[in-house]
Amino acid sequence: TWLAGGTGTKGHVVLNVLEDGKNRLSVLTPSASGWTTSAFVGAPSFGIVGVGDVDSDESDAVWLTVTDYLTPTTLSLAEIGQPPEQLKSMPAFFDASGKKIEQHFATSKDGTKVPYFLVRPEGLKYDGSNPTLLYGYGGFEIPMLPGYSGGVGKGWLEKGGVSALANISGGGEYGPRRDQPALNAHRPQA
């Protein structure tokens, strides 16, 4: 878990935290008794999120950019405490209806929990017969985040395939302390 960014508005601070390979937005609000924390209304469960203030001197509005495995990059405007209003979107290159994003955790030999994302058709039977495209990367503290790919969507997901992305050690999703034990001779533990 690490701070990926944040912004201030007239009455709040919005923190963008990378947690288990996905962004999570939190709203911090000052009061006479200290700060309170709440979830950002309408933030996606899985995806890459960018947040920036519109005019921090005058309003509590923020710009949001969001993308995930099934959603091309979108630009939205949100007032703190209200759901975002989508303003623009990049074109969709495949039909994402009937598809679902999930996150699971595998356990490595040393007991480390390794998050992975699964993009699959709804109603999928877990019987081992589903063609699956698995990608895992962990190096140079470069995180693999949930992003949109028209090629994977059109060429694989639309045809009923399953896509999996593993956030293995080394990718920086949990910082250098998590990555160090999986270097050199210990790389198979990743």
Region annotations inferred by a language model:
Residues 1, 34-43:
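Trp- and S/T/G-rich repeat-edge/linker motifs of beta-rich repeat architectures
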Residues 1-7:
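Generic long, charged, amphipathic alpha-helical segments
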Residues 14-21, 28-30, 63-69:
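Beta-strand C-termini and the immediately following turn/loop, strongest in propeller blades
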Residues 30-33, 79-81:
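Short loop/turn segments that connect beta-strands within beta-propeller blades
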